[in-house]
Amino acid sequence: MIIEIEGIKLKLHPEVYEPAEDSILLLKNLVDVKNKDVLEIGVGTGLISIACAKKGAKKIVGVDINPYAVKLAKENAKLNNVNISFFESDLFENVTGKFDVILFNPPYLPTSEDEKIDSYLNFAFDGGKDGREILDRFIYELPNYLKKGGVVQILQSSLTGEKETINKLKPLGFKVEISARLKVPFEELMVINAWRL
């Protein structure tokens, strides 16, 4: 089955996170990526990376821990006639170089051991016990991969505390703002923009 979001055609896969309100909020609030080197962590279907290609990004690297997502994102890039380098990586593990823009829609649901699902989809939701496990690892490693003057965009849920994210970014030398908000049942979604000073 092929769906279309904002003019981007996407094949779906049962083991890959299907774009939802969080993906769309990030998509509609992307920073200017024209002529920029872009890295997306956790590409899923490839929607955001493909949008960056259509908006004129110079180079795009997209990674995901889920091999089904990497394969699907490659197929979707082909479907939309764009050139993107997709490969498997646990966050920055297999990434080299520095980027102007880094994008991340992390798994943010607080998940106990008995709530985990036996599927690659678990990677898309499971944020650890407090929902911050993956996000905090990402923030800690982020300065090694973002150029000075570069920007990171993080999709944040009120479930995992935007203040905590902001308070972790600032001491690392980031100027932080919330650029978009969306109330959905049980939570508020936000896009956090943080510039490396």
From Swiss-Prot:
Reactions this protein catalyses: L-glutaminyl-[protein] + S-adenosyl-L-methionine = N(5)-methyl-L-glutaminyl-[protein] + S-adenosyl-L-homocysteine + H(+)
Q: Might you give the EC number(s) for this enzyme?
A: 2.1.1.-
Give one GO molecular function term: protein methyltransferase activity
Q: Which SUPFAM superfamilies match?
A: S-adenosyl-L-methionine-dependent methyltransferases
Q: Which GO terms describe its cellular component?
A: eRF1 methyltransferase complex
Question: Which keywords describe this protein according to UniProt?
Answer: Methyltransferase, S-adenosyl-L-methionine, Transferase
In the record, biological process GO terms are: methylation
Q: Residues that bind S-adenosyl-L-methionine, according to the entry?
A: G42, V43, G44, T45, G46, D64, N105
Which family does the entry's similarity section mention?
A: Belongs to the eukaryotic/archaeal PrmC-related family.
Q: Which NCBIfam families match?
A: hemK_rel_arch (TIGR00537), PRK14968.1-3 (NF011529)
Function recorded in the entry: Putative protein methyltransferase using S-adenosyl-L-methionine as the methyl donor. May methylate a Gln residue in target proteins.
Q: Which PANTHER family match?
A: METHYLTRANSFERASE N6AMT1 (PTHR45875:SF1)
Q: What is this protein called?
A: Putative protein N5-glutamine methyltransferase MJ0928
Species assigned in the record: Methanocaldococcus jannaschii (strain ATCC 43067 / DSM 2661 / JAL-1 / JCM 10045 / NBRC 100440)
